């Protein structure tokens, strides 16, 4: 699971990210490349097209939704099953849930690892990342390099208790 979150847990406003952090976009690409992605329909709409070199799975209740280059599932369980199959085929160990708020809320109990870009601002928004319970432990924190006028931010990897391993944050 991967997200960029403000201090007050905001991840989006009116279908958009409330910030522009090029280094975070590079981090997102490095962490998700070649891994199956699970996202809600609104998140897919905000991206606007399938992300290359990744299986894009869109979860929606809309039974008429279709889009070239994505696979559509109508519940999270079937999305996880499809992503699991693809992860085995690709030889990757992670499935990446990339949003939005409803999908994060539903998927968090199933997650064992989180990659969060924690942005040191409070912003108004309408989409939020769920609170983490005490079962999550910070494993690694790397300070970002904000450009002038950008807020400070850190790239943070969390593991659920009992799920820690030696996988470090990707370089670059």
Regions found by a protein language model. Name each.
Residues 2-165, 169-170:
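Flexible, gly/pro- and Lys/Arg-enriched active-site loops
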């Amino acid at each position: 699971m991967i997200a960029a979150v403000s201090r007050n847990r905001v991840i989006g406003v009116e279908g958009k990210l409330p910030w522009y952090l090029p280094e975070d976009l590079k981090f997102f690409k490095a962490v998700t490349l070649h891994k199956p992605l699970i996202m809600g329909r609104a998140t897919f709409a905000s991206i606007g097209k399938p992300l290359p070199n990744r299986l894009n799975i869109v979860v929606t209740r809309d039974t008429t939704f279709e889009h070239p280059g994505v696979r559509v599932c109508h519940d999270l369980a079937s999305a996880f099953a499809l992503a699991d199959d693809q992860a085995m085929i690709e030889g990757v160990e992670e499935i990446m849930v990339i949003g939005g708020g409803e999908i994060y809320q539903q998927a968090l109990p199933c997650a064992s690892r989180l990659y969060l870009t924690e942005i040191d601002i409070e912003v108004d928004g309408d989409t939020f990342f769920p609170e983490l319970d005490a079962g999550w432990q910070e494993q690694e924190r790397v300070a970002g390099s904000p450009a002038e006028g950008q807020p400070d931010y850190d790239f943070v990897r969390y593991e659920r208790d009992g799920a820690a391993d030696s996988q470090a944050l990707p370089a670059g």
